[in-house]
């Protein structure tokens, strides 16, 4: 099989108790091995991305690319699904374990759901977390969320990350370097509120 796109995931948090937890260095070695294997098969993707493509795009569907790279709004469908727009996030009913029958009886997935209006910095945190899957962030998308220049808002953080080779900057794009990917949790958290 040679699918058009490949995605590499770490174990989800609900699976962590079933398997031994690898160190950051072990996960980095595992990713490096997979990266070399996947790119050796002809797939394209920057080091630090978890999506790869034979066609040389981001390896994402247009929906995911809009959501992850362009800070697009999205509507989650289904019980406990998350939705996001330019003012906040919301969760459909069912996240606290209501039965499917109970949820269907309500005739909507919005009634009884949780909605949160978020300040720009918290919305930015969501964008950073989502775009981190691709190992890159767009400063123009960040500016749209913050309503101010992220180069000024995060001047110290960007200076530190660039000067220490954790990220690279190309136009409005920020890319994790291999060194930054090794510490991606710490790198991304510098942009959280």
Show where each model-derived region lies.
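Short, amphipathic alpha-helical interaction segments positioned at domain boundaries
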Residues: 181-193
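A short, conserved structural fragment
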Residues: 162-172
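C-terminal scaffold of the Radical SAM
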Residues: 1-148
């Amino acid at each position: 099989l040679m699918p058009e796109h490949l995605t590499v995931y770490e174990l989800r948090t609900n699976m962590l108790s079933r398997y031994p937890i690898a160190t950051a260095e072990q996960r980095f070695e595992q990713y490096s091995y997979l990266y070399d294997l996947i790119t050796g098969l002809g797939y394209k993707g920057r080091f630090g991305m978890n999506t790869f493509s034979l066609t040389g795009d981001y390896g994402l569907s247009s929906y995911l690319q809009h959501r992850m790279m362009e800070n697009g709004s999205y509507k989650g469908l289904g019980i406990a699904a998350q939705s996001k727009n330019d003012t906040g996030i919301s969760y459909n009913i069912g996240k606290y374990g209501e039965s499917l029958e109970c949820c269907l009886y309500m005739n909507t997935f919005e009634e009884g759901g949780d909605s949160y209006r978020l300040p720009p910095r918290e919305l930015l945190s969501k964008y950073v977390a989502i775009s981190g899957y691709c190992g890159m962030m767009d400063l123009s998308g960040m500016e749209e969320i913050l309503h101010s220049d992220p180069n000024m808002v995060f001047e110290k953080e960007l200076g530190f990350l660039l000067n220490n080779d954790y990220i690279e900057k190309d136009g409005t794009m920020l890319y994790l370097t291999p060194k930054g990917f090794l510490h991606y949790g710490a790198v991304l958290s510098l942009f959280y509120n």
